[in-house]
């Protein structure tokens, strides 16, 4: 038996290391909640909502149970429902569509840019109909969408914008954070997000006090006051434990995003010019937060197998376009109708990235990708 220690795998994301870095603060915050005996709609949630709103450079944050609930409640708060249409990206996680469907409205898919994973405004305008009530851009992979162009379209056609910022905590567009200046933006605090908790969680941010008040009612059974129900709400409350954890992590978010950006720069430099590998593009006037570092190649499955054999974990975001998911069979456009989304689904591969990925691990990823690309080029 060999005495040489086996080389550890490069994890896609190390959630345990994130906890270990802040263990003392986190354990103290959890103990504080347990000792308080207050587990819902208490001071931790109030504190987090105020701090997250300030971080997003806006006035109000409303904590809810998940990112999808954040989207759904934002749409409901704007009065969107049956008979309405909402323009969504064809290339996104299915939650962006499901939130629209949950209101009774119809998601209308529009393609992304050919070289950037966010909505193409030139195609958005062609999809607007008299039934369109809102645009739902997704800041996918941590890259801000072209908000100026989308706002101009929304203003001209009298539409709402609901931003899906589930992957974009701290990202900036024209110097302002995502959520600043928007009518409403929805965030997820799923554990793997740039700002994640220890389970599910989400929040809606807005500068509109009336919308914020409606959202607070909707998340709490349609009630402002116990047993007085003004509308048909739901149960979607960010609990005190998760809020306490998020307050700790929010203070470290910019630092952790900075680590992600440094790793992305390492990847962009080390993988530049490789044949058959498309690298992510940063749009002008944007500061992405690199929730994911996603490359594109027509031989994606081969590259993924090669990296797996080299002890490197990867993921695919996302392998099945939403319009081809069985969940939308008979409702969404048929195969071949959204070629850009289908191209992304066929080609994308996300490499390990996160605030606790060490530089030597990133260099190991680069070496393995280069090895594969050069071998394929010579074949």
Swiss-Prot record:
Its cofactor is pyridoxal 5'-phosphate. The modification N6-(pyridoxal phosphate)lysine is found at residue 193. The keyword Transferase applies. It comes from the Bacteria. GO terms for molecular function: pyridoxal phosphate binding; transaminase activity. It catalyses: dTDP-3-amino-3,4,6-trideoxy-alpha-D-glucose + 2-oxoglutarate = dTDP-3-dehydro-4,6-dideoxy-alpha-D-glucose + L-glutamate. It holds the Pfam family DegT_DnrJ_EryC1. Its EC number is 2.6.1.106. Keywords: Antibiotic biosynthesis, Pyridoxal phosphate, Transferase. GO terms for biological process: macrolide biosynthetic process; polysaccharide biosynthetic process. The keyword Transferase applies. Pathway: Antibiotic biosynthesis. Pyridoxal 5'-phosphate binds at residues 67, 167, 188-193, 221, 227, 235-237, 318. Homodimer. Involved in the biosynthesis of dTDP-alpha-D-desosamine, a sugar found in several bacterial macrolide antibiotics. Belongs to the degT/dnrJ/eryC1 family. This is dTDP-3-amino-3,4,6-trideoxy-alpha-D-glucose transaminase. It comes from Streptomyces venezuelae.
């Amino acid at each position: 038996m060999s005495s040489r220690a086996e080389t550890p795998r490069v994890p896609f994301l190390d959630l345990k290391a994130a906890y270990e870095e802040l263990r003392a603060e986190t354990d103290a915050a959890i103990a504080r909640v347990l000792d308080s005996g207050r587990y819902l709609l208490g001071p931790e949630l109030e504190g987090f909502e105020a701090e997250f709103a300030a971080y997003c450079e806006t006035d109000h944050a409303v904590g809810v149970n998940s990112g999808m609930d954040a989207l759904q409640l934002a749409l409901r708060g704007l009065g969107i429902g049956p008979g309405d249409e909402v323009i969504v990206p064809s290339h996104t996680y299915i939650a962006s569509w499901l939130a629209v469907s949950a209101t009774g409205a119809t998601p209308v898919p529009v393609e992304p840019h050919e070289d950037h994973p966010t909505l193409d405004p030139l195609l958005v305008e062609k999809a607007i109909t008299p039934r369109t009530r809102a645009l739902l851009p997704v800041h996918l992979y941590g890259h801000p969408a072209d908000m100026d162009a989308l706002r101009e379209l929304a203003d001209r056609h009298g539409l709402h914008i609901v931003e899906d910022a589930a992957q974009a905590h701290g990202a900036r567009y024209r110097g302002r954070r995502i959520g600043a200046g928007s009518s409403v933006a929805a965030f997820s605090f799923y554990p793997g997000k740039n700002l994640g908790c220890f389970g599910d969680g989400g929040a809606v941010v807005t500068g509109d006090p009336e919308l914020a008040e409606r959202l607070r009612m909707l998340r709490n059974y349609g009630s402002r006051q116990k047993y007085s129900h003004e509308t048909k709400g739901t149960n979607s409350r960010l609990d005190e434990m998760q809020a306490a954890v998020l307050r700790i992590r929010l203070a470290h978010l910019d630092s952790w995003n900075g680590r992600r950006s440094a790793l992305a720069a390492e990847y962009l430099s080390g993988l530049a010019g490789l044949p058959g590998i498309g690298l992510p593009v940063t749009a002008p006037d944007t500061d992405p937060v690199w929730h994911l570092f996603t490359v594109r190649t027509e031989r994606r499955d081969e590259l993924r197998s090669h990296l797996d054999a080299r002890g490197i974990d990867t993921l695919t975001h996302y392998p099945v376009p939403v319009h081809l998911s069985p969940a939308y069979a008979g409702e969404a456009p048929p195969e071949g109708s959204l070629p850009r989304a289908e191209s992304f689904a066929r080609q994308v591969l996300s490499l390990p990235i996160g605030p606790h990925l060490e530089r030597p691990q990133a260099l190991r990823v680069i070496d393995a990708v280069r090895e594969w690309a050069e071998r394929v080029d010579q074949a």
